[in-house]
Each structure stands twice: as C-alpha cells, then as structure tokens.
Amino acid sequence: NASEYGIPYDAPPIVRRESIEVAPGRRVSFLVWGEGEPEYVFLHGGGQNAHTWDTVALALGRPLVAIDLPGHGHSDDVADPSRLSPQDNAADVAHVVRAVAPNAKVIVGMSLGGLTTIALAAHAPELVRRAVIVDVTPGVNSDKSKAISDFIRGPATFPSFEELLARTIEHNSTRTVESLRRGILHNAFQLEDGSWMWRYRRFPGGGVVGGVVTATEHPNWAPLWDLLGANTAPVLLVRGMRVQSVVDDADVAELMRRRPDAVVIEVVEAGHSVQGDTPVELAEMIRDFAAR
C-alpha cells in the first residue's frame, strides 16, 4: 500500500489484531495501529472490513484503531440480522472505543460506518469529539446506492479467486488491480472445496447485513437526521463526486440546514470509497480537521 501511494516509511508499521467481548459469547475484532493512546477510530462500510483503512492509516502515521463492525471481517456475527443497524452497531462500537480509544480526537466512518458514527454520537456523545462522515448521509436510498447494491447482491461464492477478482474489478473501475487484489485477500476466504466466499454476513435475499441494502427494500435511515442535528460535535462530510457516490446536493443542503457549522469537502477524483480512491488526500483532510 505504501509503495503504491508513495508513502515513505522506514520500517513495517506496528499493527496488531485484538478483540473484546461486547455481549456474552460475542466479540468485536479490531486493528490497533502504532503505539501509544489511539488518536483516531475508523469504522468501515457495509461489506468491508477494517483493512479498508490501511492506506489511510499508513498516511496518517499516528496511533489509531480500525474496527471490524459486527458481522464483518473477523468480528462475530449476531444471531438476528435485524440487529445490525447503525444504532445496534453503535452500542458495540462504544464498548470498543471505551476500552481502547476513550480519548480519540476523531471518529471516522464511511457509508455504514458513517451512519454508525452518527448513531454513536447520540448513544455515547462523550466518545465522539469530532466526526468525519465519508460519503454517506441519512438521505441514502436504493436509487443512490444502486451501483453498490448491484455489486453486493452478486454471488456469495466464486469458483476461483480470479473470478472474484474479475467481478470486483468490473464494479470498481477507479481502483488499481493490485489494490483490489489486496482488499479481496482481507475480505474473502477460501473454502475447503477451493471456492472463495466474502467475509461478511449476507441477508437471505442477497444484500449485506447492516449496509445500504436489504433483501427486499432499502432501510429508512431518515431518523438519523434528527440524531445528527441534535449532536454538537464538529462534523466533516467528505463527499465523493464520481458516479458511485451516494450523496447528492439535496443531502448536503439538508445537512447544512440541520448543522450550519458542518464542513463539506468534495473530492472530484473519488466515488463512494474515498478511502480507496484517494486515501492520502483523505488522511490529510482528517489530520487537518482534527487540528481545528
């Protein structure tokens, strides 16, 4: 990652995986970057995992925590898939943040992670001193997220890694093949029969649990607008401007109506996955926002 984006480093980064129990018999896993008290907490999008932030973490070069949301990555699943909403996620994330990053300067969330950040600020406002929301608002709907849901609703398993990679390339035209290959190796695993499967829980109908897609219809995240409007923590919205973005002008207008103090940055070269398309630039935005 560092070589691809020209990030200088003298030695391999210090990264370790840990987990804590958030409910009896259920654990949430996370990556701890660097030494010392974490300054940032990162929450990924639906169908992703903590490694989506690897390049951003390298560019920041500061102690931080990147969490695998429930039902994603190496975190345990939940028995009831309806219990993976942003509000449910926020309760689990609060356990982790209190335990390992209680003094984090900024919580950064992308897509599902962004909605979870909004919910976290309402659930545990003392943990969210500043919030960076990456390409999502409570105004997301099925039309805005169609390109993403089309990808997520694809096959659950693939006969070979090459076929999985080919589908991923088809739906992520802004990313390099090598970056997508690395991402898949963190977000999929090989079954005993040699086929490959995504490392996240899926709805029976083919959507991704807790993300912007359900088996039958799009969740209504509009109530999160009220939570966002009531919170007083400084907010930065990073909006991708390419076609896969799920934020439109009406969403930005609604954000500014409810939070006139919010900061909005438009990233021309990024789609929905700003951390994948322009990770170094995103890291700089986060660093600058934390210093305000």
What spans do the regions from the language model cover?
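Alpha/beta-hydrolase fold catalytic core
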Residues: 1-38, 61-62, 101-103, 263, ...
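Conserved hydrolase catalytic core segment
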Residues: 102-142
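Active-site glycine-rich loops that stabilize anionic/oxyanionic intermediates
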Residues: 37, 45-48, 111, 241
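Catalytic histidine-centered segment of alpha/beta-hydrolase-like enzymes
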Residues: 270-279
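Active-site loop/oxyanion-hole signature of alpha/beta-hydrolase fold enzymes
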Residues: 23-26, 31, 55-58, 65, ...
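Serine-hydrolase catalytic-loop signature spanning alpha/beta hydrolases and amidase-signature enzymes
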Residues: 45-55, 64
